[in-house]
């Protein structure tokens, strides 16, 4: 009777879910001794291998690197599509596997001797391509699918395969007559043969004999096709432990969109992102390489907090340059910037001068630019503790726009006045760790700020006090532009102090006539040794932050005489 004795091996909702959620295979039983052994098997798996001699090599054969594997796979896929319409071996884009029956054949129950045919009947499984649900018709692959170049028969245990794979579980427990038949036929392309044999062996032994990256990728793709998540995770782990290259990392980034079970390869994808972010953290050092990277690689680099770059303004400029180089169409550029790359630019840490330029940049849709600039300005207007809260809230999410990167030039807050004289107040905050890292002779620069059309910057130093011969903390004010420009400025340095209820206390005042490239300041801003300045009980760090302020006022022409 059809389906009368088809009892589930186990409840799929509980047992299989727990099995597929495991992240390793070491704790699972080793049934390698039962592989292809009739004594421990209840079915016979017939593997029909299709294709001609040109199709006999797998993607991994002859490949010495990931790049070779990717090129081989891409070339074969394109050749098959060009010559045959559809690639039989394209397991990346395969549709759901279906059981094929022939509706024109008589019902087996009505056939002569039907009661005795269960052991001899076969369930045939092959790819159902192009979404056609009519499984009774032979799919047209553009090659002679009736040509079976090889046949392999294996003794299999349906409980072992079903426990590892929802594909085989459905095949063996779907209530149809085929699930009760002892013979099951799989029809595959010649390129898949080696990977499938490795996969079947893994389902018994939880181990693989292949060790190269191309071969592991073949097995991983086969595991995805036959829904063996544990094997995908195993391959992913082995690939993560191998030396990575830019080519392999970029290939791994594409896996989630190329496989059905993307979660199984997520750790490998994350490792690829970390590799690219670490390798290209100084994008100026690898400028040409980075400019040639695809979108996924650029996103991996821009997502890093450790990007070694002068400022977020420089990140913005780089993104625009890359987008213009990759997308000649303004419409395409706006689409990719608005929907993808804008998410990785941390607009709240851009200078106001650059944010103004964002609003008039034709590469961004006006609505996108306005939204990003308004959000950035609101963030800048928040109190420091609110900014820290916003940054903490975004630290676990994909969108890290409120988190400050490790910029080469430290961000500053600037308040500008035009009357009664051009003036600006500049706030620079330094973490205790940043200050500690300056010892014994380091320096850190602020981002540029502007007054009277001239660019200025602050720099914090660890100096040797020339009079007392000990290290100390110094602060300097410099002008960017070099040349014969003469610029008179009144300045004042101040810092917050615990002893004065955390108010800003003036440290030094002075005036200086700048010429391009010159700087003025104080080698020992606090008048104490470095050890006292950096000590745990230091009065100058409030919640681990050193708060500095500089006021600059342009001298009137009458003041210069």
From Swiss-Prot:
Keyword Translocase on entry: no
Segments forming domain BACK: 266-358
Its pathway is: Protein modification; protein ubiquitination
In the record's own words, the domains note is: The BTB/POZ domain mediates the interaction with some component of ubiquitin ligase complexes.
What name does the UniProt record give this protein?
Answer: BTB/POZ domain-containing protein At2g46260
Region listing for Disordered, in residue ranges: 1-31, 100-119
Concerning Pfam families, the annotation shows: BACK, BTB
Instruction: Tell me the InterPro entries matching this sequence.
Output: BACK (IPR011705), BTB/POZ_dom (IPR000210), POB1-like (IPR045890), SKP1/BTB/POZ_sf (IPR011333), TRAF-like (IPR008974)
UniProt xrefs under SUPFAM superfamilies? POZ domain (SSF54695), TRAF domain-like (SSF49599)
Q: Where is the composition biased (Acidic residues)?
A: 107-119
What exactly does this protein do? Answer: May act as a substrate-specific adapter of an E3 ubiquitin-protein ligase complex (CUL3-RBX1-BTB) which mediates the ubiquitination and subsequent proteasomal degradation of target proteins.
């Amino acid at each position: 009777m059809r389906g009368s004795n088809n009892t589930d091996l186990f409840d799929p909702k509980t047992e299989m879910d727990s099995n597929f959620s495991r992240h390793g295979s070491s704790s699972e039983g080793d049934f390698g001794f039962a592989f292809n052994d009739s004594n421990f098997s209840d079915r016979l798996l017939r593997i029909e291998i299709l294709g001609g001699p040109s199709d006999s090599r797998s993607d991994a054969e002859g490949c010495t690197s990931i790049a070779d594997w990717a090129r081989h796979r891409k070339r074969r896929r394109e050749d098959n599509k060009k010559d045959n319409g559809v690639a039989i071996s394209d397991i990346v884009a395969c549709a759901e596997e279906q059981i094929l029956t022939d509706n024109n054949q008589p019902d087996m129950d009505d056939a002569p001797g039907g009661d005795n045919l269960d052991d001899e009947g076969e369930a045939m499984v092959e790819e159902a391509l192009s979404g056609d649900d009519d499984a009774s018709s032979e799919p047209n692959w553009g090659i002679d699918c009736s040509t079976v170049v090889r046949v392999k028969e294996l003794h299999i245990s349906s409980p072992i395969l079903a426990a590892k794979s929802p594909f085989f579980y459905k095949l063996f427990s779907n209530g149809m007559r085929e699930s009760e038949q002892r013979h099951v036929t799989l029809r595959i392309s010649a390129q898949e043969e080696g990977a499938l044999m490795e996969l079947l062996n893994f389902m018994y032994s939880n181990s693989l004999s292949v060790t190269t990256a191309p071969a592991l990728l073949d097995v991983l793709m086969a595991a995805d096709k036959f829904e063996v998540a544990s094997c995908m995770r195993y391959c992913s782990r082995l690939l993560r432990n191998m030396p990575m290259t830019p080519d392999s990392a970029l290939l791994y980034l594409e896996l989630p969109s190329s496989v059905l079970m993307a979660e199984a390869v997520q750790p490998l994808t994350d490792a690829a992102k970390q590799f690219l972010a670490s390798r290209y953290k100084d994008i100026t050092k690898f400028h040409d390489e980075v400019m040639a990277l695809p979108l996924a690689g650029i996103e991996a680099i821009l997502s890093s907090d450790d990007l070694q770059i002068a400022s977020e303004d420089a990140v913005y400029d780089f993104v625009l340059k890359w987008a213009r180089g990759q997308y000649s169409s303004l419409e395409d550029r706006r689409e990719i910037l608005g929907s993808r790359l804008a998410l990785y630019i941390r607009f709240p840490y851009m200078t106001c001068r650059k944010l103004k330029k964002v609003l008039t940049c034709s590469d961004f849709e006006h609505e996108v630019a306005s939204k990003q600039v308004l959000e950035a300005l609101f963030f800048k207007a928040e109190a420091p503790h609110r900014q820290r809260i916003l940054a903490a809230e975004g630290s676990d999410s994909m969108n890290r726009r409120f988190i400050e990167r490790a910029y080469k030039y430290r961000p500053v807050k600037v308040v500008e006045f035009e009357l009664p004289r051009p003036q600006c107040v500049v706030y620079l905050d330094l973490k205790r760790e940043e200050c500690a890292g300056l010892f014994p002779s380091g320096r850190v620069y602020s981002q540029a700020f502007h007054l009277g059309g001239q660019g200025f910057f602050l720099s914090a130093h660890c100096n040797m006090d020339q009079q007392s011969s000990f290290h100390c903390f110094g602060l300097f004010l410099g002008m960017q532009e070099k040349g014969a420009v003469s610029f008179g400025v009144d300045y004042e340095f101040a810092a917050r102090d615990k002893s004065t209820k955390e108010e800003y206390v003036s440290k030094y005042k002075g005036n200086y006539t700048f010429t391009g490239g010159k700087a003025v300041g104080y080698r020992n801003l606090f008048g104490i040794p470095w050890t006292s300045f950096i000590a745990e009980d230091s009065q100058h760090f409030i919640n681990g932050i050193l708060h500095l302020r500089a006021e600059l006022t342009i001298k009137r022409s009458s003041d210069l005489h």
